[in-house]
């Protein structure tokens, strides 16, 4: 039986790692699933853990008021040392481009434990945009043995960097699995459905979306906080406008 340790610390990571945790837990005869959270985001992380009923085996709880990247990196690195020595996993899975991911991958490397990188291969090829995420994911990619790329483009990025094709797997993005789970939860829970419809109305959306049997399709769009202003935001708005004009039967909600 293989020991699989999944390490994450922020809300986005938790959202995308939750389906993997559930999948591994359903194969208890093949895998021992170990969940380690760093608490890089504390309250926002805990929201997702409650949603998926995930109870971490280890919690580094590194969050401190006024912490910076130096603090996060150092606390994750030293915290993971003790966790890895105790748990002795066969593989460490990290996600994306956070400081938690990079520091955890580095800690696993120091312990000579192979790393799998979920959502691998995203690149802008500018280490300062986004910062520090672009460098984080490049470093993590250099450490990782297995690369789980969401798209063919991500795979090509890794191939261009010299990663062995046999170690790259196009998996899609696990956020879609999370989306299906949440939609199913909302449909089965009248209280949650009512709360969502209230929030939609308060945001100016006129339709009680989940209450309608016959309804228009809706596309919900979110953006990284750094793209919510300046040129990035303008480009997002232009793209939404193009899509809205092309697909008039769909409502695009940003």
Residue locations for each model-derived region?
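N-terminal subdomain of nucleotide-sugar transferases
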Residues: 1-39
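Conserved nucleotide-sugar phosphate-binding/catalytic loop shared by glycosyltransferases and other
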Residues: 29-75, 79
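A conserved nucleotide-sugar
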Residues: 30-32, 237, 241-254
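A nucleotide-sugar donor-handling region in carbohydrate enzymes
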Residues: 36-38, 42-43, 143-235
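Proline-aspartate-enriched helix->loop->beta-strand connector
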Residues: 88-90
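An aromatic- and histidine-rich active-site surface loop
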Residues: 93-111
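A short, histidine- and acid-enriched strand-loop-helix "catalytic/donor-clamping" loop
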Residues: 117-131, 143-145
